[in-house]
């Protein structure tokens, strides 16, 4: 008989200690108060319609499930529902395509606001034991959640089958046998942040809670394939491909898809189902409503959600995500090498079945165990979870407290029974009683597990570029602290905290390694008072005070940096730092900076961010907020700003803007119109400055700078003219432009985040500029642009021409590869015709493809500039924006040859 584990997960924790999870009770205002959760919605007990043909698959008949097991699972589901607060429309989803979905506020978001990738707090996950409440099940979404209707949804089965068919949800429920069983789902990236602390992978920071177990119900896949008459291997039926409804940016735009071998799909022992229920109810949107794959023992990445097509093929899936995701490449292969040498397409590196893994969950991170007469008289119980893949049973879990010299065998609890083929699809729980004095003398606690094939976990982490399948020993460090005056205690530290949350012993060790690798001159100064500040700890409230040009502090990966002395030297201008001053800008920093910039940042580190709730002489946090036993898990309530503002842009904040119009100007140029949050707002972008567009693309934050082409006083919207860099066009950039392709695939009604203003140049009208806070004046402007660099030049020209009293002359030299690449040509030519004395425009193209081209071909040369821009003078400024090689090899040297003082008279956007 299966045993419930909920009440045993934290039974030996010190009452009132930091991190202890108490029993949850329904909120007094909860709609579930007083209900007994019979789970009797329309799907709980399907009634087959009379006179309906049911295609039975006798060879894979369901096991004779023990009624006691079913009742126990039902009790767990009911208990979890009572303890979990209702899901709500999260304020963080406002302005995203997922704003219609209700979610649990305690989920830790790992990729910003959108898409929704999240895991529950580890302690809360373990509190619920064997069956995870659906709102707390980890979520892996590559993009917006598709909207689907139960009555309209169909799944198509096609390819190498005798009878291609489409099935409605009603047919799946009524015409096929169902299978219901608990299955543990695990993301292949579980524990990835540990790898990212060693060396950054291309994946985001999963903690140790990318694992959940629920009861799934659905149709056996093999029954569907048999009904459609799947062909034999000799006729080419080798792979089963799955395709979802979600349209994603990867590969220039594609649906999420993957495949498994036919042998897996048709194996009755594998219990593969097409699921439509989870914990007794219809699937929720985040978990694939109305239909998804469940492949027990496999990684989550093979279990396609929002399932629309099943294709029987000879080859594996051709989906971008089948090849560019869920691989474990050798440690020497980075992203660049993987792309250059096509490592993604080597079949030996694909991940299907999970590997053996285990985690310590008790003690939890930053838990404090006081050492006193009461605690030392009873043992402390270590606890955690373990799992393996392919249906293999976890047979042994061991704990060491001396670095692996000796191992203690733990008690292992398997709450599930194996299926009739002897396979285990769920996690198990382990525990070990230890003496408190032994904990006091230990420096760390480590765990490893073994499965029935005698596979075990490696001692050390093995890095790979995707950060997947990390299963090294899970280590918890111990340190002595003073929870109360006159007492000592043990504080426990897990290796990392999920997402961008700071904390964990790996972050501290990384800091020490960086300090040890510092140049000799830096090492020598460590003993000086200035360098001693690197060991100082700062609270978030202290950092927030340093948000101005007089003192600009930022937080990146838990480290505090004073960027004040770098403000004037920053290539992106002062605003690029000030817009993040006083905040944690880890995500933004990683999105736009190279490894070189990250190393440069170390020169400005002054200390670390305080992430713990204790100090050496302070008490642990034993408070309970109000009468709610689960308030500690609720997200902090943020005070909302007024709904209506005259200016949309808010420094240090991202604002959501909806795409309301998209026009094709040419085959690769689009004009996008984005609505501001309020109809009566203006964007609030000074002339000469730019904005960042932010989006999660291929699981990473992508930020790109754009200058609007609409005038600064447009009300309710702004416009961008964007050149789309498609993949496979430019050999140097085979994947094309990430953001431009993302925008091109963005549907009307979708949102992007906008941040700004940024930039160090501001045109204040009538020839007056403010550059790095210093004023400059010009009567004549030499305006040099390349490619999309025309947009800030165009913006300044717009402002000049809109003011009838602004008499500034503009001499534009605009370089492109071909005539077809010229942006805003009609507008520029129109101004030149209407105002020939004030606006002069000259084009330079590398290769002319049209007859009768009257402008220059080749590159910007000294001769071109001498003929088409004014000579240097006290009232002449040069403005330039374009690719770095153009500025370095064409603009700078040729202006100097003409006599320009490029340090004083050249403004580069």
Swiss-Prot record:
Regulated by the nitrogen source and controlled by the circadian rhythm. One of its GO terms (molecular function) is sulfite oxidase activity. InterPro entries: Cbr1-like_FAD-bd_dom, Cyt_B5-like_heme/steroid-bd, Cyt_B5-like_heme/steroid_sf, Cyt_B5_heme-BS, FAD-bd_FR_type, Flavoprot_Pyr_Nucl_cyt_Rdtase, FNR_nucleotide-bd, Ig_E-set. FAD binds at residues 704-707, 721-726, 733, 738-740, 791. Its cofactor is FAD; heme; Mo-molybdopterin. Residues 652-764 form the FAD-binding FR-type domain. Residues 535-610 form the Cytochrome b5 heme-binding domain. Gene3D superfamilies: 2.60.40.650, Cytochrome b5-like heme/steroid binding domain (3.10.120.10), Nucleotide-binding domain of ferredoxin-NADP reductase (FNR) module (3.40.50.80), Oxidoreductase, molybdopterin-binding domain (3.90.420.10), Translation factors (2.40.30.10). Keywords: Disulfide bond, FAD, Flavoprotein, Heme, Iron, Metal-binding, Molybdenum, NAD, Nitrate assimilation, Oxidoreductase. GO terms for biological process: nitrate assimilation; nitric oxide biosynthetic process; sulfur compound metabolic process. It catalyses: nitrite + NAD(+) + H2O = nitrate + NADH + H(+). Mo-molybdopterin binds at residue 187. Its EC number is 1.7.1.1. Pfam families: Cyt-b5, FAD_binding_6, Mo-co_dimer, NAD_binding_1, Oxidored_molyb. Heme binds at residues 570, 593. It is an enzyme of class 1 (oxidoreductase). Binds 1 FAD per subunit. Binds 1 heme group per subunit. PANTHER family: SULFITE OXIDASE, MITOCHONDRIAL, SULFITE REDUCTASE. Homodimer. Nitrate reductase is a key enzyme involved in the first step of nitrate assimilation in plants, fungi and bacteria. Belongs to the nitrate reductase family. This is Nitrate reductase [NADH].
